[in-house]
Amino acid sequence: MDIKHHYIEKGNGFPLILLHGNGEDCSYFEHQMEPLSEHFRVIAIDTRGHGQTPRGTAPFNIRQFARDLLEFMDGHNIEKAHILGFSDGGNIAMVFALAHPERVEKLILNGANLNAKGVKPSVQIPIEIGYRIARMFASKSPEAKQNAELLGLMVNDPNVNPEELSQIKCPTLVIAGNKDMIKDKHTRLIAQSIPGAQLSIIPGNHFIANKNPETFNQAVLEFLL
């Protein structure tokens, strides 16, 4: 593996892996570590090119991040885990569950999306404009190249067909804010496409784990316990 992940860990028991969103790092879950660690061994990872985890030389896309997660679990002797992913982290978790179902006990998808069309236009259009501009200057500026890669995740990934989600057999919770930047009908499509998935819409925007942690944590624990 071309990188070594930075991560924070707290608690004992069955592993619960937390995956942050685009441009974030493991500190996003500051309001989850303590309450969730009362029941689980909670591991929050900085994904490739985020936080203190280096960019490395491998491709910078959701499927590579899912491969990275597999290597992280193998390297830390984690045979199976609950996986909670937020935003792009939710997309990583979704792709990982499809590729390695035997490694996922329960799955939580928070603010995930199948493709760029799942994001409200008021959010997605500026992202796509920023992506085009960053690509224009990527060869001249390391900062522009980094921005192009990060924005590219939200323009080009994960491109999962909803029919594929029928292959996810583990218990799944799909959770989002009632004012999320992900379209409500898109979140519901994800939940409806996964057999037996639970859907929870709670007050808040895209960042409910950080902005409405008490309600979010309650929903997560009710699902996991």
Language-model features: where?
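Conserved HGGG/HGGXW glycine-rich cap/lid loop of the alpha/beta-hydrolase fold
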Residues: I8-Q52
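Active-site loop/oxyanion-hole signature of alpha/beta-hydrolase fold enzymes
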Residues: E34, I43-L84
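Flexible "cap/lid" loop of the alpha/beta hydrolase fold
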Residues: N91-A99, E105-I133
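Hydrophobic, aromatic-rich cap/lid helix
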Residues: F137-E163, K179
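Short beta-strand/loop motif that positions the catalytic acidic residue
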Residues: I168, V174-A176
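Conserved alpha/beta-hydrolase "acid-adjacent" motif
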Residues: M181-H186
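Catalytic histidine neighborhood in serine/cysteine hydrolases
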Residues: Q192-F207
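Catalytic histidine-centered segment of alpha/beta-hydrolase-like enzymes
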Residues: N205-N217
